[in-house]
Amino acid sequence: MRLINFDETSDWFEAFHRLEALLDKKRSKGKMVVFIDELPWLDTPRAKFLSAFEHFWNDWGAGKHNLLLIVCGSATSWMLDNLINNKGGLYGRTNCEMHLHPFTLAETETYLHRRGVTLDRYDVVQTYMLTGGVAYYLSYFQPGLSLAENIDAIYFAENGFLQTEYDRLFTSLFADNAGYRRIVETLSENRYGLTREALAEKAGIALGGTLSNMLKALVKSDLVTIYWNFGESKRTQYYKLTDMFCLFYLGFVQRNPTNNRTYWYDNQNRSRSEERRVGKECRS
């Protein structure tokens, strides 16, 4: 049921005023829930969405004790800068954060099984290592195909579902994503991670608040992990790329020079042939 015709509203201020009027008409003493999905994408240039949203909550919503406002968004940097760490009209307004994490290895196995994708545990581990347990990526695995056939169809075939996902990932998570990509791609070439200073030098990004904020957003997005080396000072932090999809994409998909659409299947067969050859040499 469409309760508000947004085609007839002149701006976001009017849209929120209409929402207020609609909720006032209900005069409900029970809990009322307003859910706004993908909040960052509503804040387009010159839309003044954030100002209207602040006005809606501070002047009306915050005083409604039976109103629960739930917002979500995949653009991590926007959510951090404009909502969670807001220093303006929305400062300190969030009551609870819910960070959605990917599936664990066990949950990945259960999900695949319930979708009818039959893989042995070795292949389930490989699947987890190239998807990171992200349900969206796992949803493209088709029953009846081997792991190699699924990987080729999803990552390497023409119009493969996840062939361009790397670009979409950064566009959806970060508004100005060039710096984030440089950080991730630099870390992908340094498997043991880098200190903040070494990362700044290798990625060509100046040390300072901008780099710090980008690293915080990457950590919050589960793309990068902070760790400390045993025996070193606690002040020496290392940043390591741990997102499995990015590692697989940068390590294999981006480096597929021949654009071979059966790359993984062929690579698997070559590996098996090499194993058989080595085995014969060892026995002779």
For every predicted segment, state its role.
Residues 1-269:
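Phosphate-binding site recognition
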Residues 275-282:
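Conserved small/polar residues in nucleotide/adenosyl-binding loops
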